[in-house]
Amino acid sequence: MEITFQKVEHRYQHKTPFERRALYDVDVSFPSGGYYAIIGHTGSGKSTMIQHLNGLLQPTNGTVQIGEHFISAGKKEKKLKPLRKKVGVVFQFPEHQLFEETVEKDICFGPTNFGVSVEEAKQKAREAIELVGLEPELLARSPFELSGGQMRRVAIAGVLAMEPEVLVLDEPTAGLDPKGQNELMEMFYKLHKEKGLTVILVTHNMEDAAKYAEQIVVMHKGTVFLQGSAEEVFSHADELEKIGVDLPMSLKYKRAIEEKFGISIPKATLSLEDLTHEVVQVLRKGGHESCSS
């Protein structure tokens, strides 16, 4: 299900003295089945942008097309319920939205709300809890007896139980330790590959953006600043830093090595493994001569 933003603008509290423009002239497409990252400094418009994907926000100008659904300025979209079934959104700290007596009831809430029978919803809950790497035995427990990481996985299972075609992730690993962050990101990538889900990730973690995303959209002051593959985007390191966007750690190390040893590493290195390989290649080609001079 392809998603397209066409000249989208969004203003909060439009036509009031408190009006604030959050998005303008946003033209971007997310073809079906891809893995995308949206990055940018705080306040760049990332979260406002993704709230247009399932009709939580409506453009002030322009159109957002999600598959067969059109959300346009001044026109009320009548079929938001089927749209919200197809576009699952995992907001920051989704565990704060848990409220039912048991894990099973919490996961079943979404499917039953969309008209699925109780028995079918229970089956979906069993499938979803296994997708997020939890044991089915937890279905009978209160979600509030679980660890923070388990609660987050339960909340994500509630989104997956609705079998969305698009999964939107807004800082999904916020507050987790490094091990938990890595496990969750690997889980999302596995779902993307095995289920063919379109994934749109909003993140401040540049390592995750570089590692997982096929295309990266850089937002700045409410509009698209850059778009391309990780290699293309992070080749503009100086420009990114000027607008407050961090760089992957491997690029920071690359710069430090170049400055310290007086060598040039031409290729953008987006992982420490890539960096190690490129340093070895440069030294083999005679880059060590620069080091000794």
Swiss-Prot record:
Pfam families: ABC_tran (PF00005)
Membrane topology type: Peripheral membrane protein
Enzyme nomenclature, EC number: 7.-.-.-
Record's keyword annotation contains tRNA-binding: no
The keyword Repeat is assigned to this record: no
Domain ABC transporter: 3-246
GO-annotated cellular components: ATP-binding cassette (ABC) transporter complex
Primary residence: membrane
Subcellular localization: Cell membrane
Entry-linked InterPro entries: AAA+_ATPase (IPR003593), ABC_transporter-like_ATP-bd (IPR003439), ABC_transporter-like_CS (IPR017871), ABC_transpr_CbiO/EcfA_su (IPR015856), ECF_ABC_transporter_ATP-bd (IPR050095), EcfA2 (IPR030946), P-loop_NTPase (IPR027417)
Annotated GO MF terms: ATP binding; ATP hydrolysis activity; ATPase-coupled transmembrane transporter activity
Residues reported to bind ATP: 40-47
Alphabetic keyword roster: ATP-binding, Cell membrane, Membrane, Nucleotide-binding, Translocase, Transport
Subunit-level organization: Forms a stable energy-coupling factor (ECF) transporter complex composed of 2 membrane-embedded substrate-binding proteins (S component), 2 ATP-binding proteins (A component) and 2 transmembrane proteins (T component).
Function in brief: ATP-binding (A) component of a common energy-coupling factor (ECF) ABC-transporter complex. Unlike classic ABC transporters this ECF transporter provides the energy necessary to transport a number of different substrates.
NCBIfam families: ECF_ATPase_2, PRK13634.1
Family membership noted in the UniProt record: Belongs to the ABC transporter superfamily. Energy-coupling factor EcfA family.
Protein name: Energy-coupling factor transporter ATP-binding protein EcfA2
Gene: ecfA2
